[in-house]
């Protein structure tokens, strides 16, 4: 996928050592968007950071390749909120959105209250949502409704928890195949 720039967007608290996003970063040399505050994520700050990452050169120098966003959990809501407000969405070819949580549930931690309401606007680029049946942070019907609002294709990964390190997916070959399909289309 050298014809595209892959930008990994972790969710709340970042993606740890065994997470598929971390493994992809290590195995493929892809970039991780590092946020200033992983514990108390402020939507506006995270959106500004994404704009900075897309407008500025990546760590390896100038790069005009189209971008594939790979978001997990709260990172999915970052993509939706950013796309609804940024004038730089033309830099993105597509987005893989994995395990979007329901930030409007009553039991959401107070650190995530700034992510209400969830942005449901149509995304201006291709996107694909992968959700899990039995995700403790978001019901399948909510993930499907978000995908419909975003104009995303959607699929279930089956019963995989939050599709994170605890799900035991390793480098998650299925996700890589979906990302490759998005990058080619």
Please state what every model-predicted region is.
Residues 123-131, 135:
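Short beta-strand/loop motif that positions the catalytic acidic residue
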Residues 70-80:
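Gly/Ala-rich beta-loop-alpha elbow adjacent to hydrolase catalytic centers
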Residues 41-44, 160-171:
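Catalytic histidine-centered segment of alpha/beta-hydrolase-like enzymes
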Residues 2-65:
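Active-site catalytic motif of lipid deacylating hydrolases and related acyltransferases
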Residues 16, 136-142:
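Conserved alpha/beta-hydrolase "acid-adjacent" motif
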Residues 11, 34-38, 95-105:
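Active-site nucleophile loop of the alpha/beta-hydrolase fold
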Residues 29-32, 148-164:
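Catalytic histidine neighborhood in serine/cysteine hydrolases
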Residues 68-70, 95:
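Conserved alpha/beta-hydrolase fold motif
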């Amino acid at each position: 996928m050298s014809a595209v720039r892959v930008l990994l967007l972790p969710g709340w608290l970042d993606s740890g050592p065994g997470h598929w996003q971390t493994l992809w970063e290590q195995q493929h040399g892809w970039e991780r968007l590092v946020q200033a505050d992983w514990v108390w994520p402020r939507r506006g700050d995270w959106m500004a950071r994404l704009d900075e990452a897309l407008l500025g050169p990546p760590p390896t120098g100038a790069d005009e390749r189209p971008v594939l966003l790979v978001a997990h959990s709260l990172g999915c809501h970052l993509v939706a909120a950013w796309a609804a407000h940024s004038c730089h969405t033309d830099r993105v070819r597509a987005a893989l959105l994995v395990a979007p949580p329901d930030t409007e549930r009553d039991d959401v931690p107070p650190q995530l209250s700034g992510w209400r309401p969830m942005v449901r606007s149509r995304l201006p680029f291709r996107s694909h949502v992968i959700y899990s049946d039995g995700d403790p942070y978001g019901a399948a019907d909510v993930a499907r409704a978000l995908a419909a609002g975003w104009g995303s294709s959607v699929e279930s990964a089956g019963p995989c928890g939050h599709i994170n390190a605890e799900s035991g997916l390793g480098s998650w070959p299925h996700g890589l195949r979906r990302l490759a399909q998005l990058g080619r289309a």
